[in-house]
């Protein structure tokens, strides 16, 4: 089943059509342009409910359901994007070969990265700067919803990460107010399984 989805995602990418799919952890449909596909994750230029580009999302191929190509409302969406002068300046150079490579490349290109652990913690996300990635875990210096950096970074299991977002309006607003974090002291690093 995942292989059939990959074929359809590659079709969406090569034909530059808007994809629409349902994701079991979100309410409603997700819409966007598929920009690249890796072994596990694919890169999507997200089109939000206001018919505007709103950053990028990397979803697990195995998590998407009811993929529609093209989006049944593609003509309307394309016309609205055009009228609003919405465009993607360029595809970000995100390495999708593995989750650690994805996280490192997104962290290098964008000021903040959002991770989701939708199976373990539905409805929650964690936003911050990647400090370190090991074979099994991610060390993330997190920022709270008030744009205040936590004093200690948190560790997350890579196996629990189901989605990675970056370049969206919310991440940009947090960075605008919170700025860059001060480097944490090694002795204060929080551990998370």
Predicted regions mapped to residue ranges:
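Short aromatic-glycine-enriched beta-strand elements
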Residues: 41-44, 136-140
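Preference for intrinsically disordered or flexible, low-complexity segments
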Residues: 35-38, 134-136, 160, 187
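Short beta-strand-centered aromatic/proline hotspots
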Residues: 28-36, 125-132
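Short glycine-rich, low-complexity segments
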Residues: 1-29, 47-123, 144-193
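N-terminal beta-strand/beta-hairpin edge segment
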Residues: 34-50
